[in-house]
């Protein structure tokens, strides 16, 4: 995947608020949130704030190793229950591998993501941004802001 979609902290918050706006209409339906670790951790905090929910748990599924999608996903930890009155959130649905596990673990949950790629899109109940399948998403927690020297410093003035 050579093309990248860069997500800033501001854009993540804007997109998560859009998602919250869709979910707030059913606010009496929700008892809590399950964040899919690690991608859903930051969005879950933002979503919990916007919806006034205090109960946030995690399901930990190893899907990626840095920038490489793993074939065999491993459930490290799961939240209890079948997902009734729960929002499960991840940052992205990609090929659908993790989403299929989430659907089996929490069949009654409302599963949402910020970003959705074509192969996994049908597995989520709601999402905000369409992303082409061949595009890699760079999330703000995976990047750092660093100083870039001016170009002139590459040239010695004699």
From Swiss-Prot:
Binding-site residues for xanthine, renumbered to this chain: 94, 137
Cell location: Cell inner membrane
Entry superkingdom: Bacteria
Gene Ontology biological process: GMP salvage; IMP salvage; purine ribonucleoside salvage; XMP salvage
Amino-acid positions noted as binding guanine in the UniProt annotation, renumbered to this chain: 94, 137
Pathway in which the depicted protein is active: Purine metabolism; GMP biosynthesis via salvage pathway; GMP from guanine: step 1/1; Purine metabolism; XMP biosynthesis via salvage pathway; XMP from xanthine: step 1/1
Protein name, entry field: Xanthine-guanine phosphoribosyltransferase
Organism: Buchnera aphidicola subsp. Acyrthosiphon pisum (strain APS)
Organism lineage string: Bacteria, Pseudomonadati, Pseudomonadota, Gammaproteobacteria, Enterobacterales
Designated gene of the protein: gpt
């Amino acid at each position: 995947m050579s093309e990248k979609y860069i997500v800033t902290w501001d854009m993540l918050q804007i997109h998560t608020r859009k998602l919250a706006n869709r979910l707030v209409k059913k606010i009496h339906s929700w008892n809590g949130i399950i964040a899919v670790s690690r991608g859903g951790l930051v969005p879950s905090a933002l979503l919990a704030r916007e919806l006034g929910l205090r109960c946030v748990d995690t399901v930990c599924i190893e899907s990626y190793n840095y920038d490489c999608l793993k074939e065999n996903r491993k459930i490290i930890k799961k939240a209890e229950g079948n997902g009734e009155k729960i929002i499960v959130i991840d940052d992205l649905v990609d090929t659908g591998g993790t989403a299929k596990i989430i659907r089996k673990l929490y069949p009654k949950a409302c599963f949402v993501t910020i970003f959705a790629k074509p192969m996994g899109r049908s597995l989520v109940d709601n999402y905000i941004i369409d992303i082409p399948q061949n595009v890699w998403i760079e999330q703000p927690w995976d990047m750092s802001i660093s100083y870039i020297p001016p170009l002139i410093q590459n040239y010695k003035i004699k």
